[in-house]
């Protein structure tokens, strides 16, 4: 796999800048294209060479962040060592910036159909992937779908609770649900 092009690198930098601005400003509406450009270290007019609009930046950023979340969840499910898995889960739940951004995405999804569709699709993909894994482990298809739905909901909910809001009981429930369906070694 080759190095990403300069244009791809700049698009990622702009997406990271949007993410930082949203977290700092606490709102998509309070974040301007000028804020994003300044955070990315470029002139506001340059953003239009990489994205058509602020909404376009948001959608690409959302896709990028949701892919990162999906990869972290995949890593978590593939980890068989109980201590390592618990550490990965804690790191995921402690990633306050990512979790705050994820919460903002869900709020934006209420007003922006494209964001809502993306979130729904990613949640469905997670649930389907979990169901497939459970079926490969010998669980009946209907039960696998039901259990995958529960675990997807628990995992999705866990990453939408900002630091300080997550209770120890909720964290333990998340870990227990994961271990029950995908036992560590």
Tell where the protein language model's regions lie, with residue ranges.
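Solvent-exposed, amphipathic alpha-helical segments
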Residues: 17-25, 71-76, 105, 154-162
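Amphipathic, non-transmembrane alpha-helical scaffold segments
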Residues: 7, 11, 62, 66, ...
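Short, basic, alpha-helical segments at the C-terminal edge of helix-turn-helix-like DNA-binding modules
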Residues: 33, 63-70
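Hydrophobic/aromatic-rich alpha-helical bundle segments in the mid-to-C-terminal region
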Residues: 116-120, 124, 135-185
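Helix-turn-helix
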Residues: 13, 17, 21-56, 60
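Hydrophobic alpha-helical connector segments
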Residues: 60, 71-100, 136, 141, ...
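Amphipathic alpha-helical segments used for helix-helix packing
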Residues: 94-120
């Amino acid at each position: 796999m080759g190095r990403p092009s300069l244009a791809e690198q700049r698009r990622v930098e702009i997406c990271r800048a949007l993410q930082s601005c949203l977290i700092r400003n606490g709102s998509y509406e309070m974040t301007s294209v000028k804020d994003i450009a300044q955070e990315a270290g470029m002139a506001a007019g340059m953003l239009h060479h990489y994205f058509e609009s602020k909404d376009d930046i948001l959608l690409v950023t959302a896709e990028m962040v949701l892919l990162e979340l999906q990869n972290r969840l995949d890593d978590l499910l593939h980890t068989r060592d109980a201590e390592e898995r618990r550490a990965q889960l804690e790191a995921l739940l402690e990633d306050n910036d990512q979790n705050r951004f994820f919460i903002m995405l869900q709020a934006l999804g209420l007003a922006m159909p494209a964001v809502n569709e993306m979130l729904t699709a990613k949640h469905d993909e997670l649930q389907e992937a979990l169901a497939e894994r459970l079926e490969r482990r010998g669980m009946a298809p209907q039960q696998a779908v039901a259990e995958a739905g529960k675990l997807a909901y628990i995992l999705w909910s866990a990453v939408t609770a900002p630091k300080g809001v997550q209770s120890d009981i909720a964290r333990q429930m998340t870990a227990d649900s994961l271990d029950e369906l995908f036992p560590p070694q």
